[in-house]
Amino acid sequence: MIQIKLWQGRFSKDTARIFDEFNASIMVDINLFEYDVMGSVAHVKMLSKCDIIPEDEGKLIVNTLYEILNDFKEGKIEFDMSDEDVHMLIEKELIKRIGQVGKKVHTARSRNDQVVLDERLFCREKNLYLQELIKNLIDTIIKLAEENIDTIMPGFTHLQKAQPVLFSHYILAYAQMLKRDLLRFRQNFISINLNPLGSAALAGTTFDIDRFFVADQLEFDGVTENSIDTVSDRDFILEMLFNIAMLQMHLSRLAEDFIIFNTDEFRFIELDDAFCSGSSIMPQKKNPDALELIRGKTGRTFGNLIGLLTVLKALPLSYNKDMQEDKEFLFDSIDTAEKSLIIVNEILKTLKVNKENMLLACKSGFINATDLADYLVTKGVAFRDAHFVVGNIVKYCIENNKSLEELSTEEFKRFCDKIEEDVFKFISLENCIKRRKSYGATSPELVKKQIENLKEFLRAYE
């Protein structure tokens, strides 16, 4: 007869029901079911290889584990709080099906190293998927930039018009952020892809196991080096949570920009109806809810990172039950990041860019004032003096309700006699853009270079 709890031999009474409910993690870590089976299969194959269990029993266990996995995928495995966690659920199901032989599956293993294995397998798969989603989004941004290679818009500092830039240059800034995100996830993959199994509870095992065989079976790059550290380590999860928080911060900034640019006050872009919603009372409203949710859910990913850091901050070595709390943080952040990346990608694919409104916005706000100062520098004026002169010119324009382009040469000369007729060509928006040729700047030729560099990065990325 199968015991209710597989570890209850040392206890003389049942645990309190309220504690069972408090202790159970099955409703959360059920998400690790497939990874737990994969790990158990590799572990049992190793036990057979090392003559720790007979070969025929090993095959029976492996075949039964696959049957259990198939039944789980078909919704045939029932579970509740009494199963405690996914590891106990699978082992109890195995014993129920093949009896005494099933009890050998946990030889030379602890739930302490077992759960780390499951989490590493899960994180590895999700890490690779997130990398693909990020690459897809970078590719979409590149295409959007190419479609708007010459579109001029105001660049902003302090949410005030600053200097003219190309929309392609602006949107590629987010591609660069995502590129850094991608590289962080690749580095995180290195931390993830190590086999922890064989560390057992904390001190390793007395059985003559082969950890490298398990690593090979599960396509890990190697094994962890210290069994105490292995069962205590959640750094790879923290790295993933940080990477997701950073990624979401980037997506949230894009969302904020687009929410602003989509308003009637800006009308730089128009979001597709598929990613907006209406109001229950105001029939005219088209709200950018998808972007607002990305912005809002970003806070959850920050909270998940801080939550796990707080759980781990004062834990003594090695394993402690506190670590059970890591999964909700992890699952929630990954789910948020996956959906956010997919939604932002679709928003960009369906985005309408209002080029005329962007250009019109550049006609006000003295967006070419820096170029006027640069013009004076070319005439031999020290930049700080040029800055002061242009500040006075802008003040004059504001007082007289004029733009820089509307001033006459004579008016310019009141402030500096070195200003000539050629100033108007110098401060035209098109020339303001074209002259910015420092590497990484907003001129069309350099933006095209940025695009080509990003394309080459994606082609070479592995």
Swiss-Prot record:
The keyword Lyase applies. Its main location: cytoplasm. GO terms for molecular function: argininosuccinate lyase activity. Pathway: Amino-acid biosynthesis; L-arginine biosynthesis; L-arginine from L-ornithine and carbamoyl phosphate: step 3/3. The keyword Chloroplast does not apply. It is found in: Cytoplasm. It catalyses: 2-(N(omega)-L-arginino)succinate = fumarate + L-arginine. Pfam families: ASL_C2, Lyase_1. Its EC number is 4.3.2.1. Gene3D superfamilies: Fumarase/aspartase (C-terminal domain), Fumarase/aspartase (Central domain), Fumarase/aspartase (N-terminal domain). Keywords: Amino-acid biosynthesis, Arginine biosynthesis, Cytoplasm, Lyase. CDD domains: Argininosuccinate_lyase (cd01359). InterPro entries: Arg_succ_lyase_C (IPR029419), Argininosuccinate_lyase (IPR009049), Fumarase/histidase_N (IPR024083), Fumarate_lyase_CS (IPR020557), Fumarate_lyase_fam (IPR000362), Fumarate_lyase_N (IPR022761), L-Aspartase-like (IPR008948). GO terms for cellular component: cytosol. PANTHER family: ARGININOSUCCINATE LYASE (PTHR43814:SF1). HAMAP family: Arg_succ_lyase (MF_00006). NCBIfam families: argH. This is Argininosuccinate lyase. It comes from Caldicellulosiruptor saccharolyticus (strain ATCC 43494 / DSM 8903 / Tp8T 6331). The gene is argH.
